[in-house]
Structures are given as C-alpha cells and as structure tokens.
Amino acid sequence: MLGMLGAGAAGVAAAPWLQRGWEGFLGAASQADPTGLTGVLPNPGGFRYYSVVGSVPRKDARTYRLKVNGLVDRPRTYTLDELRALPQKRVVRDVQCTDGWRVADTPFEGVPLSVLLDAAGVRPEGKALHFTCFDGVYRESLTLDQARRPDMLVALKMQDKPVSHEHGGPVRLYAAPMYFYKSAKWLSEITVTDEVIPGYWEEYGYDLDGWLDGEDRRGDAQAA
C-alpha cells in the first residue's frame, strides 16, 4: 500500500513536468506543421494548438513591443514591463472554439483594453480596433464599444501563468464573450480605425462579431 501511495505521489509531482513537456512538443510540432493538423492532438491542459503559419518568432521581455496607434491623439509603443505595470484585471470564463471544444473556468489576467484606449485618447472618428499579430498573418477586429467592455483584455497571464509562446504569448488578446478565434495570439499592434476591418477568419466566412451563445452583447460597462 505504501508503495502504491508513493507511486501515486510521484505521479502527481511529475504531472506538471509531463504536461509542460507535452505542451512544448505540441507547440514545436505545430510550428513545423503548415497543415495545422497538430491542433487535433490532445493536451492535458485542455487546449489545442493552432497557427495559420508554419513558424512564429519568439518574443520576450527584451524584444516584445505593443504598438497602439491609428485614430488616437497619443500613439504609443509599450514594452512588456510597461504593460505589467498598468492596472490588471482577472477574468474567469469558459473558453470555447467553433469546432466544439471547450475549456471550463479558464482564468486570464491582463490590461483591460479600455485602459490602453483611454491612455491613447481615441479621436471622435474612431469606431473600431484592428489587431495585428507578429506571426505576420493573423489579424482580428472589434468595434470600439465591444473593446471597451470590461471583459476584453490584453492578456499577460493564462491559467495563472505568463502566457506561453505556444498559447500566443507573451501577449495575446482575450475577448471573453466571444468564440476563441477572436482572441488573437501573438499580439503586436492595436490600430484604431473608422470602420471594422474583417479579421483572418471573417474573410473565410466566420461571423464578424463571434458572440458566444447566451452572452450579453451590450458594449458597455454593465455587460460584464
């Protein structure tokens, strides 16, 4: 019995290490797989890995930058440390993809989009946000009202850890009330525009808003 307990304890202790190893393998495999088929492989954390390109450069605190520009009075470029120093918000929701998989009660933490917009000073003609990613291909969009909801984050943490490269780190978008394709990975630029510019998947027929069923779709502070 003691032997069995010891083996069980060892298994529990090794579980995080095994999960990190499997996640690292899947992340590396997905970058070498232009088909995206590695996204169907199971992962203990519940997430699947997918990228629309074969390889994504890695960024860290030394090399990462986030630009906020467009129809604003005060364009700015943030370092990772500067983002960490801003007010943070924690949001816990189910993450859901359009192909049916779901990860329940997933915590994200980061800077509310509204904080960055207020700091930039959006001009009256600004109506939407266009998000660009440093994979060089992916992009997304939100209306300005959607972006000001308190459950829209520039996420620095996911599942209580810094967002890993495989999950779109060091910084990604988290659009809590929407399907996960709206939560762009590897975020590098936020541009305020005068109209909504369709994102990557919207050009293939996905819904422009991507609301989850049952979500309050108001674009105001009471929506979350």
Which ranges hold each PLM region?
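N-terminal export signals
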Residues: 1-20
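Structured, non-membrane catalytic/scaffold regions adjacent to prosthetic-group chemistry
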Residues: 16-224
